[in-house]
Regions:
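Active-site beta-loop-alpha junctions of metal-dependent nucleic acid enzymes
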Residues: 2-6, 23-46
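Short, solvent-exposed amphipathic alpha-helical segments in soluble enzyme
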Residues: 13-16, 39-41, 68-69
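Short small-residue beta-strand/loop micro-motif enriched in glycine and branched aliphatics
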Residues: 19-24, 76, 101
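Loop/turn elements at helix/coil->beta-strand transitions in domains of secreted/extracellular proteins
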Residues: 47-48, 72
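RNase H-like two-metal-ion nuclease catalytic core shared by retroviral integrases
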Residues: 54-56, 61-64, 69, 76-99, ...
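C-terminal domain-tail junction helix/linker
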Residues: 101-155
Length: 155
């Protein structure tokens, strides 16, 4: 996901089964920055990461480094076939609720990105039986109680 003036980008990763999202800021869309961000995001989840599907952009030129670092298989979508990475495209669309296309990402902090990602990872999804991506990915149940204000509060 790229910002308005193409100076800052967000690398987004989506886990297929749980719909769990990870995202990090990178300066531009250069291969070394993207590679560092992907490995930094996935290193804590190395045991759960077996395959990745990337688009054919130059930003993934260092894909072999990612594969070795994370001991994962890398696949590439066909050129101009964004539907082969539908979950990632959908995740980018959900993130656009917080960071719209006309927005300069240069003023956005990593904490703000993480806040938006956390909101999405704790949003119940119909496809997951109204569980959250966080619950499915980590195998934990988060209980929500109804407050007198009519909003759900986390216990």
């Amino acid at each position: 996901m790229i910002g308005k003036n193409h100076q800052i980008a967000l690398v987004t990763l989506a886990e297929r089964k749980s719909r769990y999202i990870l995202a990090a800021q990178v300066p531009g869309k250069h291969a070394l920055g993207v590679t560092a961000a992907v490995t930094r995001l996935l290193r804590p989840h190395k045991g759960k990461c077996y395959t990745m599907t990337f688009d054919n952009g130059k930003k993934f030129a260092e894909h072999e480094t990612i594969a070795v670092e994370l001991d994962a298989d890398i696949y590439f979508a066909h050129p101009c076939h964004s539907w082969e990475r539908g979950l990632n495209e959908n995740s980018n669309g959900l993130l656009r609720q917080y960071f719209h296309k006309e927005m300069e990402l240069i003023g956005v902090t990593q904490e703000q990105v993480q806040w938006a990602v956390d909101r999405l990872n704790h949003r119940p999804r119909k496809v997951l039986g109204f569980r959250t991506p966080f619950e499915v990915f980590f195998g934990k149940t988060v209980r929500y109680t109804k407050s007198p204000l009519g909003v759900a509060l986390r216990n």
